[in-house]
From Swiss-Prot:
The lineage of its organism: Eukaryota, Metazoa, Chordata, Craniata, Vertebrata. Residues 462-493 have a biased composition (Low complexity). All members of the FAM83 family of proteins share a conserved N-terminal DUF1669 (domain of unknown function 1669) domain of about 300 amino acids. This domain mediates the interaction with casein kinase 1 (CK1) isoforms. Therefore, it has been proposed to rename DUF1669 the polypeptide anchor of CK1 domain. Residues 342-364, 374-384 have a biased composition (Basic and acidic residues). Phosphorylated during mitosis. This is Protein FAM83D. It is found in: Cytoplasm; Cytoplasm, Cytoskeleton, Spindle; Cytoplasm, Cytoskeleton, Spindle pole. Keywords: Cell cycle, Cell division, Cytoplasm, Cytoskeleton, Mitosis, Phosphoprotein, Proto-oncogene. Residues 1-299 are annotated as: DUF1669. Residues 340-585 are annotated as: Required for interaction with KIF22 and function in chromosome congression. Belongs to the FAM83 family. Was named CHICA (girl in Spanish) because it interacts with KID. GO terms for molecular function: kinesin binding; microtubule binding; protein kinase binding. It comes from Homo sapiens.
């Protein structure tokens, strides 16, 4: 096997693909895997002997060799047994085993972001991508860029919702105090993921500051690791974390070679890149993946600090207690991220007198003529215009200091009210026309039975009554075509009664006289003229009404955006003059 792998390792560089997908030989080397197992099992001497025997180049420097030996955990060691016990207890506490072929660890649900997270859906636009670079040490002069530490602290202070930190080592006191102050005073949630191998340095800093990170209500500290290599002997090699980025509110991210240490902020040379916009979505996804793979602080590390009595609460803490204390905070956070501010409620200012007076007015409009009604209620309409305008406003609208969106809402409300008033006016005009036509028919019959022997007076009374009927029924009328049809039928009915009355068998003595024949011819001639005059007037009014209705319909459809439906009736007479007599130029 070693000879076969040697042939794979000695593939010339020309066979490797400089572009495109890498070859399998570039991704995996069996000889190097065997050399790594020799290093873990026998140490540096066995590793060097294997390289000489297989004629392999030295692919690990001495520092890497010592780092791998320190990171290796053998099955019989105390640390590996404690870690396995902790994992078993963690899995048994959740009791998520499905009893199928798959192992128990695949059935464990990932930890939740219990402190809240920005409500960005997948693919949501986060703005244009922008890049801002900082270097340590910073440039000379007042106009030089900020240092990495100063730029990072400035970004942390600008957070409003959440801060997510992924770091290898965290020992800077100033940055930790900034995060602690942001949690307590601004109510910003802070997630910290640290390398498991370097977590002891973070706990040493907290012990020196006499700070308990697990007691912070809006701060969570967990550990992550790099890739894990498993040898055939059962030994596993745990990789380190070299990812360094800080996610702020889901819209900005600070990444680079800068670590949260005093030496990187003052002595070491480092850089920091601040990204904003759509590129932050990738860092958002990466942090959620790392948080799902993270683990709480290991009891093994806490045992080293039990002698100082500063972290006793971490050993005996209950995970459920933190969830109970953060329940209300989580609801408030989710509500603030996903909901809009509520508008102030305004009490309707419409008095009860307006409602009480509206009913008798509606009853009178069906029996009294429009001229009398307008003359008796014109002053009252002018006094009630302000009150009706106030009642048309919805109670959810905020009247003082309106914004642009609220003005658009009131415009749509005014449109709905105008459409409501036009529809109800049509019904009132049709009911008045029908009532007056019936009363006119009754008066005409009475005039014929009583005043017909006088001749001239009876014939002159009928056209006048018909004129009054036609004028009262069609003047100031903005109803539909059906209401005008009722007017035409009402005016035509007295004329038909008049023509049949001349042939009534109750008056045979007048048919043979010459004066009666002249009178009949003149009256018929006048009746035809009056009939033509009335028909022409009715036709012109109908044409005018159809034109007015067509223009009004076009206006409401194009400009008001009126929708059909049932509307509530509000003060119809306040806009009657405008609706019935528009000025067309």
């Amino acid at each position: 096997m070693a000879l076969l792998s040697e042939g794979l390792d000695e593939v010339p560089a020309a066979c490797l693909s400089p572009c495109g997908p890498p070859n399998p030989t570039e991704l995996f080397s069996e000889s190097r895997r065997l050399a790594l197992e020799e290093l873990v099992a026998g140490g540096p001497e066995a590793f060097a002997a294997f390289l000489r025997r297989e004629r392999l180049a030295r692919f690990l420097n001495p520092d890497e060799v010592h780092a791998i030996l320190r990171a290796a955990e053998r099955p019989g060691e105390e640390g590996a047994a404690a870690a396995a016990a902790a994992e078993d207890s963690f899995g048994s506490s959740h009791d998520c085993s499905s009893g199928t072929y798959f192992p128990e660890q695949s059935d464990l649900e990932p930890p939740l972001l219990e402190l809240g997270w920005p409500a960005f859906y997948q693919g949501a636009y986060r703005g244009a991508t922008r890049v801002e670079t900082h270097f340590q040490p910073r440039g000379a002069g007042e106009g030089g860029p900020y240092g990495c530490k100063d730029a990072l602290r400035q970004q942390l202070r600008s957070a409003r919702e959440v801060i997510a930190v992924v770091m290898d080592v965290f020992t800077d006191i100033d940055i930790f105090r900034d995060l602690q102050e942001i949690c307590r005073k601004q109510g910003v949630a802070v997630y910290i993921l640290l390398d498991q191998a370097l977590l002891s340095q973070f706990l040493d800093m907290c012990m020196d500051l006499k700070v308990h990170p697990e007691q912070e209500k809006l701060m969570t500290v967990r550990t992550i690791t790099g890739n894990i290599y498993y040898a055939r002997s059962g030994t596993k090699i745990i990789g380190k974390v070299h990812e360094k980025f800080t996610l702020i509110d889901g819209i900005r991210v600070a990444t680079g070679s800068y670590s949260f240490t005093w030496t990187d902020g003052k002595l070491n040379s480092s850089n920091l890149v601040i990204l904003s916009g759509q590129v932050v979505e990738h860092f958002d996804l990466e942090f959620r993946i790392l948080y799902a793979q993270s683990k709480p602080i290991s009891p093994k590390l806490l045992s080293h600090f039990q002698s100082s009595n500063k972290f006793d609460h971490l050993t005996n803490r209950k995970p459920q207690s933190k969830e109970l204390t953060l329940g209300n905070l989580l609801r408030m956070r989710l509500a603030r991220l996903s909901s809009t501010p509520r508008k102030a409620d305004l009490d309707p200012e419409m008095p009860a007198e307006g409602k009480a007076e509206r009913k008798p007015h509606d009853c009178e409009s069906s029996t009294v003529s429009e001229e009398d009604y307008f003359s008796s209620h014109r002053d009252e309409l002018q006094s009630r215009k302000a009150i009706d305008a106030a009642t048309q406003t919805e109670p959810g609208e905020e009247m003082p200091g309106l914004s642009v969106s609220e003005v658009g809402t009131q415009t749509s409300i005014t449109t709905a009210c105008a459409g409501t008033q036009t529809a109800v006016i049509t019904r009132i005009a049709s009911s008045q026309t029908t009532i007056w036509s019936r009363s006119t028919t009754t008066q005409t019959d009475m005039d014929e039975n009583i005043l017909f022997p006088r001749g001239t007076q009876s014939t002159e009374g009928s056209p006048v009554s018909k004129m009054s009927v036609s004028r009262s029924s069609s003047l100031k009328s903005s109803s539909s075509v059906s209401s005008q049809g009722s007017v035409a039928s009402s005016t035509g009915s007295p004329a038909s009664i008049r023509t049949t009355d001349f042939h009534n068998p109750g008056y045979p003595k007048y048919l043979g006289t010459p004066h009666l024949e002249l009178y009949l011819s003149d009256s018929l001639r006048n009746l035809n003229k009056e009939r033509q005059f009335h028909f022409a007037g009715i036709r012109s009014r109908l044409n005018h009404m159809l034109a007015m209705l067509s223009r009004r319909t076009l206006f409401t459809e194009n400009h008001l955006g009126l929708h059909s439906g049932n509307f509530s009736r509000v003060n119809l007479l306040a806009v009657r003059d405008v609706a019935l007599y528009p000025s067309y130029q």
